[in-house]
């Protein structure tokens, strides 16, 4: 009787600008505090595409082959000797950022700001668009039975929305402006509504995406064309009947940031989520004399348990955001689909024996 074939670890690897390959990597062995995961669902993020097209994002440069992917869920295959809270067969969502040391940022609970943090698919750290992947067990969270693998993978972008709404102080009764109806804008809309926002208006260039925003809960939408930032602000105020207390900017576009400052209520908060140019001209005086606080967002921290609770309780529904699914073997086709701007969230299915949501 022939021996069973050893499982392969097919992985999606970027070698440099425009050079994306499917390759077989060795199956890693988990350390004492790690788990080996059989990957199931991994979403494609804009950052993955940037590394593919440009080979870099800012100072993060692909200098050696790197496995992509960081929006992920999977099943525990093997546990390290010191892992007590997980066992083989557990379904988990993966928080991609795991601190390497207990530095000053970890001590105050803001580990996302740690300069030495491990983060999936950020050079030089490999991601998890592969069959098998090992990760710090403390940053793998068990999924309830009523939360699917795909919902588990969506916790990563959902966490950006949670962190942004926390930074903005979104609470009961607030009017909120969300600039941008891409995946991050959409999850921010969902979180703002779940946190008690009375009205949320979403702006975007795309009528199709704004239609989806209305479908998932936006109270108001505004399609942008060639208006000035001041005109956009006036239109937002006209729709809401007042200026929003919180604006969450998810595009990174300079004109959108400017509109956000003009639009936000005096004493309110503008949260910058989208990453654009390093240098951007903004009407800072207009923010200063009206005490509009401008806050940044870098990834997230302490969000996975909250996100899991929101999904399990059906406080948010991320399923409508998933528009395309591809097996890992067709990852190159999936990335081309993303590049063409088709769909919203594209999922890659990494387990050849389980392509279900």
Swiss-Prot record:
Enzyme class, spelled out? oxidoreductase
List its EC numbers.
Answer: 1.1.1.-, 1.1.1.14, 1.1.1.9
Q: Where does NAD(+) bind?
A: 184, 204, 209, 273-275, 297-299
Q: Which organism is it from?
A: Pongo abelii (Sumatran orangutan)
* Alphabetized CDD domains for the sequence: sorbitol_DH
- Residue positions binding substrate: 51, 156, 299-300
- Where in the cell is the protein located? Mitochondrion membrane; Cell projection, Cilium, Flagellum
Give the InterPro entries listed for this entry: ADH-like_C (IPR013149), ADH-like_N (IPR013154), ADH_Zn_CS (IPR002328), GroES-like_sf (IPR011032), NAD(P)-bd_dom_sf (IPR036291), PKS_ER (IPR020843), SDH-like (IPR045306)
Q: Which Pfam families match?
A: ADH_N, ADH_zinc_N
> Could you tell me what this protein is called?
Sorbitol dehydrogenase
Family membership = Belongs to the zinc-containing alcohol dehydrogenase family.
According to its record, what are the GO cellular component terms? Answer: mitochondrial membrane; motile cilium
Q: What is its main location?
A: mitochondrion
Role, per record? Polyol dehydrogenase that catalyzes the reversible NAD(+)-dependent oxidation of various sugar alcohols. Is active with xylitol, L-iditol and D-sorbitol (D-glucitol) as substrates, leading to the C2-oxidized products D-xylulose, L-sorbose and D-fructose, respectively. Is a key enzyme in the polyol pathway that interconverts glucose and fructose via sorbitol, which constitutes an important alternate route for glucose metabolism. May play a role in sperm motility by using sorbitol as an alternative energy source for sperm motility.
An example Gene Ontology molecular-function term? L-iditol 2-dehydrogenase (NAD+) activity
What cofactor does its activity depend on?
A: Zn(2+)
Which keywords belong to this entry? Answer: Acetylation, Cell projection, Cilium, Flagellum, Membrane, Metal-binding, Mitochondrion, NAD, Oxidoreductase, Phosphoprotein, Zinc
Q: Which residues carry this modification: Phosphoserine?
A: 211, 225
Oligomeric form and interacting partners: Homotetramer.
